[in-house]
Amino acid sequence: MSALKQIKFDEKGLIPAISQDFKTGEILMFAWMNQESLKLTIKKQQAVYYSRSRQKIWFKGEESGHIQHIKEIFTDCDNDVILLKIEQIGGISCHTGRISCFFQQLDKKNWKIITNMIKNPRDIYG
């Protein structure tokens, strides 16, 4: 795939990927991709990531049903970060049951939770 030739994966063969709600612009999550997951994302028009902890390809929503449909894909000026503009199915992108993984805000010296849980993770994952 010629589009992948300009992408700069790191020494581990990975590239950071940010997902953003295509309608609101809200940043939903950060994950890693490898060449295979990026190819699958482009081919299937569905977010596919690489799990460093599990050392395997991870289809977003494969367990939870919270799939990310791709609307647009961007790379940054250095071609070393991917931005996915997505439609989040089910309204939950974070494994904590929230719309976004970025739900903690620094309030002077402490982290404050600013977003409510939409669904308890036990109800999502069992």
UniProtKB/Swiss-Prot annotation:
Catalyzed reaction equations: 1-(5-phospho-beta-D-ribosyl)-5'-AMP + H2O = 1-(5-phospho-beta-D-ribosyl)-5-[(5-phospho-beta-D-ribosylamino)methylideneamino]imidazole-4-carboxamide
Q: Which GO terms describe its molecular function?
A: magnesium ion binding; phosphoribosyl-AMP cyclohydrolase activity; zinc ion binding
- Protein localization: Cytoplasm
What Enzyme Commission number does this protein have?
A: 3.5.4.19
Q: In which pathway does it act?
A: Amino-acid biosynthesis; L-histidine biosynthesis; L-histidine from 5-phospho-alpha-D-ribose 1-diphosphate: step 3/9
Q: Which UniProt keywords apply?
A: Amino-acid biosynthesis, Cytoplasm, Histidine biosynthesis, Hydrolase, Magnesium, Metal-binding, Zinc
Q: Detail which positions bind Mg(2+).
A: D76, D78, D80
The record, for Gene3D superfamilies, names:
Phosphoribosyl-AMP cyclohydrolase (3.10.20.810)
Q: Does the keyword Cell inner membrane apply?
A: no
Q: Which cofactor does it need?
A: Mg(2+); Zn(2+)
Q: How the cofactor binds, per note?
A: Binds 1 Mg(2+) ion per subunit.
- Stored Pfam families: PRA-CH
- The enzyme class is hydrolase
Q: Name one GO biological process term.
A: L-histidine biosynthetic process
- Residues engaged in binding Zn(2+): C77, C94, C101
One cellular-component annotation, GO: cytoplasm
State how it assembles: Homodimer.
Its annotated function is as follows:
Catalyzes the hydrolysis of the adenine ring of phosphoribosyl-AMP.
Q: Which family does it belong to?
A: Belongs to the PRA-CH family.
Protein name as it appears in the record: Phosphoribosyl-AMP cyclohydrolase
To which species is this protein native?
Vesicomyosocius okutanii subsp. Calyptogena okutanii (strain HA)
Report which gene this protein is encoded by: hisI
